[in-house]
Amino acid sequence: MKKIIVTGGSGFIGSNLVKYLLKKKYIVINIDKLSYSANPYNLKGISKNKNYHFIKSDINNRKKNIQIFTKYKPYGIINLAAETHVDRSIDNPNNFVQSNILGVYNLLESLRSFIKKNKKKIKLVHVSTDEVFGDVTKGRSDEKFVYNPSSPYSATKASADHLIKAYVRTYKIPAVISNCCNNYGPNQFPEKLIPKLIFNIINNKPLPLYGKGKNSREWIHVKDHCSALLQILLRGKLGESYNVGS
């Protein structure tokens, strides 16, 4: 059975991905520092699954990363460890720089050290966002779309994408990038738009309006995203980016 590390596996997308991979008969190692948006309850009921392992750790901790790689020798890593809320990034961009840029840098350096010492490849799927493309006024963005981030959040994710590509080219790190649209589904943190709208409607509260109310957004169910991430891990070409949408 192949072993897959999921970083940020106790969050919204991460917890759904962990469950999806377990159903597909993979051994899953969940690395999560359990920040405010992570919730161990998301994975209630699978802690006794012999194919599931949880490690509380921060991907900025290189020593711990290498210890985990050495112990489990995974086939791949799907990196979901990130700060993701746009409004929070405007209020406090520092946390986003620490997690989304430095976290990816330290994860890459950990991988580079492990691969150099052990001569064993571990494929990395870095989960990014379509927010890196900024406002798309016509049609759809594709993988060759020019980056134009418009918030501290999207700027940090764009920076991480460029780091990934540079490490693939410079150090031959086996990595790919996915850029996905907005997700919805079970276990989503209530600050996100769809659960927030539902909560406000139920409680007769006003609905948030962004811009003039004429903007359009694309959503994908989180389980479809999980399916795409596994296919990118198994079939994605190293150094490439893959847009994921509905």
Across the structure, where does each feature detected by a protein language model lie?
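Hydrophobic residues at beta-strand termini and immediately following loops
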Residues: I55, S178, L209-Y210, V244
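Glycine/proline-rich active-site loop of Rossmann-fold NAD(P)-dependent oxidoreductases
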Residues: A158, N183-K196, N203-K205, L209-Y210, ...
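N-terminal Rossmann-like NAD(P)+-binding domain of SDR-like oxidoreductases, especially those catalyzing
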Residues: M1-N183, K223, L233
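A short, basic/aromatic alpha-helical/loop segment that forms part
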Residues: T170, S216-W219
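Short alpha-helical segment that forms part of, or immediately flanks, the ligand-binding pocket
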Residues: N94, I198-I202, R217
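Short, conserved catalytic or interaction motifs in soluble domains
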Residues: Y36, P186, S246
